[in-house]
């Protein structure tokens, strides 16, 4: 290899490194904007597609099935145990919630007939996809499975996710609509 080839390869290498560094800075900037603008929520868990979700309504009065929402669960014994098991993460001032708000899909609302057991959640006669319960978590600990057969009462919803291993109403049951913080739609998601 002659000196000219080596200089040319070194020049291309430096350009490549510069481009990669520029892209990394841009990605960090975009990520910072999404998380600090107050217009987006991010998800990097396995329970929903990873990425950014645009907030379309804060403190919604009404939610309908299949809408995506965030909620801050009440600080109950069950959610405290979920926190200890690391199913949910600690929140902070930014979140104004004792845990990081959870991102879920409305599976059933007030007035819907729901049957829930280890085989899944059936809403108005239709079995929800990925709603079968797991008897144990990834660490081999037993999961409390929600059982219900009746009409969802006013002010309550069933929250689910499109993933088999999601921590959702299969385990914690009905959620008070007052705990719902935002309606969101996918903005930039993957996986």
Language model features with spans:
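Protein maturation boundaries and topogenic segments
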Residues: 1-101, 150-151, 170-191
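Short, surface-exposed secondary-structure boundary micro-motifs
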Residues: 58, 74, 119, 162-163
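Mid-length scaffold segments of soluble, non-membrane domains
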Residues: 96-130
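Acidic/glycine-rich C-terminal interaction modules and beta/coil loop segments
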Residues: 131-184, 188-191
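Solvent-exposed loop/turn segments at secondary-structure junctions
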Residues: 77, 114, 121, 165-166
């Amino acid at each position: 290899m002659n000196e000219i080839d080596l200089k040319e390869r070194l020049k291309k290498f430096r350009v490549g490194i510069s481009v990669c560094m520029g892209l990394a800075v841009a990605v960090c900037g975009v990520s910072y904007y999404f998380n600090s603008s107050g217009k987006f929520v991010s998800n990097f868990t396995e329970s929903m597609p990873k990425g950014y979700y645009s907030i379309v309504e804060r403190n919604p009065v009404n939610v309908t099935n299949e809408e995506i929402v965030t909620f801050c669960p009440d600080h109950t014994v069950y959610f405290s145990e979920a926190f200890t098991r690391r199913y949910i993460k600690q929140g902070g001032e930014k979140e104004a919630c004792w845990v990081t708000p959870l991102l879920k899909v409305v599976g059933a609302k007030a007035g819907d007939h729901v049957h829930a057991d280890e085989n899944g959640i059936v809403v108005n006669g239709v079995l929800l996809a990925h709603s079968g319960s797991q008897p144990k978590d990834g660490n081999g600990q037993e999961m409390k499975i929600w059982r219900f057969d009746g009409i969802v009462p006013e002010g309550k919803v069933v929250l689910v996710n499109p993933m088999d291993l999601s921590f959702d109403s299969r385990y914690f049951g009905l959620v008070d609509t007052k705990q719902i913080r935002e309606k969101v739609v996918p903005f930039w998601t993957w996986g």
